[in-house]
Swiss-Prot record:
Organism: Drosophila melanogaster
Keywords: Cell membrane, Cytoplasm, Developmental protein, Membrane, Metal-binding, Nucleus, Phosphoprotein, Wnt signaling pathway, Zinc
Modified residues (Phosphoserine): S320, S327, S329
Subunit note: Interacts with dsh. This interaction may be stabilized by zinc.
Name the UniProt record assigns to this protein: Protein naked cuticle
Comp. bias (Basic and acidic residues): 802-811
Length: 928
């Protein structure tokens, strides 16, 4: 089985790491993922992925990653050897440590204890059914509480170690990719999803799969299908996940075990978490740390369950606040029940039921606290102050958003002060990681503001998505575990505010806004600054997510860019060395090239001109962009661009049609595309303005998270805004322009009408209609007349001698260039030119076109812009075909500028926003 293979592989590769007996106790997938993850919990670019949702969902699994991020090098080195044992055993130790939180430090300290606890946790995990081994040994509540404490401790130590390893590993990132085929049974399971993941061997652990890697996988699955998959409230849904790991030469096929969800809150959350990937759920089990379903499952169970729960919650969260709230109520029940078992742990249980999810989220956060908690974690309340704080934070998250908000600064201070040295280093990393996660939570819970945002930031580093669902849950459950949440509140405050602050109210927004905070996390370095920026950006991101593109589109984009994103995704959420800005240009260039081609053929009038232009006839029409471009050049596209700029070069240039004819081919490649982009100066400006409201841009949650995390708040506001809107709009533009030429033209007319203040709407409408009609007629007439003339000339030339041929050749050039200089068409063109000139003389039309495109761009209607631009270009082309190369050259220059700026920024924006926010931010920042 995969578990055996993984065991063998882990035993072989993880020689330096403690092997945990939990492997035998846990399911194969759990062993595989858990061991591997624990083995190299710190390694994986997916950690950033994990930080987005999986970490949020699976704090423990991603805790190592977060720990890598948050744990200071000292802690990392100290926890280095422990991390495996702590990471797994901490999960398990929470199972054993539940009897006494004093066991937590011991368990954390002793790998053997951790292994035992890991087994206990595994038994508790059985509670999920999938993890029956762990589940059975420990009582549910006990496990939950212990899982919370142990999780915190192990995450703290393991996290430090992981972060340390990851910190070192980041320097020598080795990418390994595997594909994950996910299919959901029932509901939207008919969608087979295939993801390609890159595992980053940041630790240098032989590229072992880590929790973070698993988390990244699960998170990706979640991002793709998790939100679309709806699990019956207390029902279950099975997601089949097949993991094939090719880079290692080992392929893991993990048919996800159907995840039956137990009745009740645990069921529902566990089912969702399980739902994600049962195979991944096994992986996520270490990640989620048991899950709410596990309730009291030991840390491993908590890790798996919480991770599942996280996934379940994020899904519910995305699915609806109500459902998430239902889960919350269930968690509250479990939390209330768990606190009965152990109030400190009980709060952990709350955190476990509801907070426990947060424990996962805060686990790594708490692990930081936990390393001190391990140091002084004899009792969960005082010794486990870090753990308690963690649990309390979870409880606060679950139960006391207010307390979290109140305690957030205190918690942060406490969290930073208690392990002051480690914590600060950890805080630096955790600020980055947690801020990313917090950003996710904020994105999901925009409610998390000021102090809540601060509080959330640290805990968010662990489980942003999970925290997000738990946020409103915690808001709903604030009364539960208030005593401990207060002490834990300081820690929980950072993790909790995202949960608590988010509140159920924003849950629906979280579906859209859930990641809006990600731009918020743009300043991951300082919580306070980030809190302020995130608060500001959170508002923007809320808007951004409100205008978010279709999630399916984003998912497809994410899938396409998954590999690149994987490269981009680092544990720290910082752009890694492996994150190459070059990818941004490449990603952008492809869309740009496609969009250029589309744009070339996109505009109705240029295409019309191209089709009718003898130059187009001369040039293969099959090459629609070149043909359209050459044809349009004959009718300079540059003038439209200039016209868009408000410069009416066309009217002046119409007298130079013959010159333009010669340059048709030089300009062809640029003109149409630039013609469409010609308006793009305004479009670009509009897009930039629209992009300036970068948060309003449509960012997939994951991309938003990356964007927010990697790109500073300023960075997100800077380059990404301009680029993303352009990109997002670019592809649609050609489509609509091609499909809706008339509509685009009408939109052009409408935009002109709307811009009547600058120009009479009637004249402009008539102008547009006349232009289009005349252009089409003239072009057709041109073509016919040119053909006739050519035919006549050819016949005449054939009848005549070489002199006739000479005259024929003389005539042919104009005929061939008749699009610009056709005699009859020239007259018509002159009319159009005059008509256009008369209209253009009203300079407003071109500004109108420009402003209209800008409006359209702001509304993500680049299509309209392109249509308008195409029409404007067509108009300008009618003139421009008659206009000299001056217009063309100027147009080309303008268009080139526009091309680089608008097309790159548009594509840049599209790719940047939806695919590689951080990559593109780097590039765009450089570009910008």
């Amino acid at each position: 089985m995969a578990g055996n293979i993984v065991k063998w592989w882990k035993h072989k590769i993880l020689g330096g790491y403690k092997q945990f007996s939990v492997q035998e106790c846990t399911t194969d997938s759990e062993e595989l993922m858990y061991h591997q993850v624990r083995a190299s919990s710190s390694c994986s670019a997916p950690p950033d992925l994990l930080l987005v949702s999986e970490r949020d969902n699976n704090i423990q699994l991603r805790s190592p990653v977060v720990n890598i991020i948050t744990t200071p090098p000292g802690n990392a080195s100290g926890a280095g050897s422990k991390q495996q044992s702590h990471h797994q055993t901490n999960h398990h130790s929470s199972g054993r440590s539940h009897p006494g939180h004093t066991a937590h430090p011991q368990d954390v300290s002793s790998g053997g204890s951790h292994s035992k606890h890991l087994r206990i946790s595994s038994t508790s995990n059985g509670k999920h059914g999938k993890y029956s081994n762990m589940q059975q040994q420990l009582p549910q509540d006990e496990d939950v509480v212990d899982a919370a404490a142990t999780m915190q401790q192990q995450q703290h130590t393991g996290h430090a170690h992981s972060r340390h390893l990851h910190h070192h590993k980041e320097e020598r990132i080795r990418l390994e990719e595997f594909t994950c085929d996910v299919s959901v049974e029932g509901g939207k399971s008919s969608q087979p999803l295939q993801f390609s993941f890159t595992f980053y061997d940041l630790d240098g652990h032989h590229g072992k799969i880590t929790k973070d890697d698993i988390v990244g996988i699960v998170y990706t699955i979640y991002e793709s299908i998790g939100k679309s998959v709806v699990v019956p409230h207390c029902g279950s849904k099975t997601i089949n996940v097949r993991l094939t790991v090719s880079p290692e030469g080992k392929s893991k096929s993990q048919p996800v075990v159907p995840v039956p969800v137990a009745a009740g809150f645990s069921s529902s959350h566990a089912s969702k978490l399980k739902k994600l990937p049962t195979g991944l759920a096994a992986m996520s089990k270490p990640l989620a740390g048991g899950g709410v379903g596990s309730g009291g499952a030991s840390a491993l169970t908590t890790s798996a369950g919480n991770r599942r729960q996280h996934r379940y919650r994020p899904r519910k969260l995305i699915k609806s606040d109500d459902e998430d709230d239902d889960s919350n109520s269930e968690k509250e029940k479990d939390a209330a029940h768990a606190p009965a078992a152990d109030q400190p742990s009980g709060s952990g249980t709350k955190a476990t039921g509801k907070s426990h999810h947060h424990q996962s989220q805060s686990a790594r956060y708490h692990q930081k606290n936990n390393s001190r908690a391990e140091q002084c974690c004899t009792e969960q309340n005082t010794p486990d102050n870090g753990h308690n704080t963690y649990e309390n934070m979870l409880n606060l998250k679950c139960c006391k958003p207010e307390v979290d908000q109140v305690d957030c600064p205190s918690h942060r201070q406490h969290h930073q002060s208690h392990p002051n040295h480690q914590m600060r280093q950890q805080d630096i990393y955790m600020k980055q990681a947690t801020q990313r996660v917090k950003m996710l939570r904020r994105a999901r819970k925009q409610k998390y503001q000021d102090h809540c945002l601060e509080t959330r930031q640290r805990s968010l580093s662990v489980g942003n998505d999970s925290a997000c669902p738990n946020r409103h849950l915690q808001l709903q459950q604030p009364p539960v575990g208030h005593p401990q949440p207060q002490s834990l509140n300081h820690k929980s405050a950072s993790g909790s505010p995202p949960l608590g602050v988010g509140g159920g109210g924003d849950m629906m927004l979280d579906g859209v806004q859930l990641r809006q905070p990600r731009p918020h996390s743009l300043t991951p370095h300082q919580h306070q600054q980030q809190n302020q920026q995130q608060q500001q950006q959170q508002r923007k991101s809320a808007e951004c997510w409100k205008s978010a593109l279709n999630r399916n589109d984003l998912i497809s984009i994410i899938r396409e860019s998954m590999e690149k994103n994987r490269l981009c995704f680092q544990l720290n959420g910082k752009p890694q060395a492996n994150v190459s800005p070059i990818r941004q240009p490449a990603a952008q260039q492809q869309p740009q090239q496609q969009q250029r081609q589309r744009c070339n053929t996109g505009s109705k009038i240029p295409t019309l001109i191209t089709n009718h232009s003898p130059v187009a006839q001369q040039s293969p029409l099959s090459c629609s962009p070149p043909t359209a471009e050459p044809t349009t050049p004959s009718i300079p596209a540059a003038p439209p661009a200039i016209e868009v700029n408000g410069q009416q070069h066309h009217p002046t240039h119409p007298t130079h049609p013959s010159h333009h004819n010669h340059h048709e081919h030089p300009q062809p490649h640029i003109p149409i595309y630039h013609q469409q982009l010609a308006i793009n100066p305004a479009v670009l400006a509009a897009q930039q303005t629209h992009n300036t409201a970068h948060n309003k841009l449509n960012l997939c949650g994951y991309d938003s998270f990356l964007h927010a995390t990697i790109c500073g708040g300023g960075a997100a506001a800077h380059s990404p805004p301009a680029t993303p809107s352009n990109v997002a709009t670019v592809q649609p533009i050609p489509k609509k322009s091609q499909k809706n030429l008339l509509q685009g033209y009408q939109r052009l007319e409408q935009s002109q009408q709307q811009q009547q203040q600058q120009r009479s709407s009637k004249d402009y409408k008539n102008y547009g209609n006349l232009i289009y009609a005349k252009l089409s007629e003239q072009l057709q007439q041109k073509d016919r007349e040119q053909r006739r003339q050519r035919h006549k000339q050819q016949q005449h030339q054939m009848l005549q001698d070489q002199p006739k041929d000479a005259s024929r050749s003389e005539q042919r050039p104009p005929t061939s260039n008749s699009s610009s200089a056709g005699s009859k068409i020239y007259g018509d063109a002159v009319e159009c030119a005059h008509l256009l000139a008369s209209e253009e003389e009203d300079l407003p039309p071109s500004p109108q076109l420009t402003s209209t495109p800008s409006k359209v761009v702001s509304t993500d209607t680049l299509i309209d812009l392109n249509d308008d631009v195409g029409e404007a270009v067509a108009e300008a082309v009618t003139e421009g075909g008659k206009q000299s190369l001056e217009a063309e050259e100027s147009g080309q220059q303008v268009e080139v500028e526009l091309d680089t700026s608008a097309s790159s920024s548009m594509i840049h924006r599209y790719v940047h926003e939806h695919i590689h926010h951080h990559y593109h931010h780097f590039k765009e920042q450089q570009d910008v």
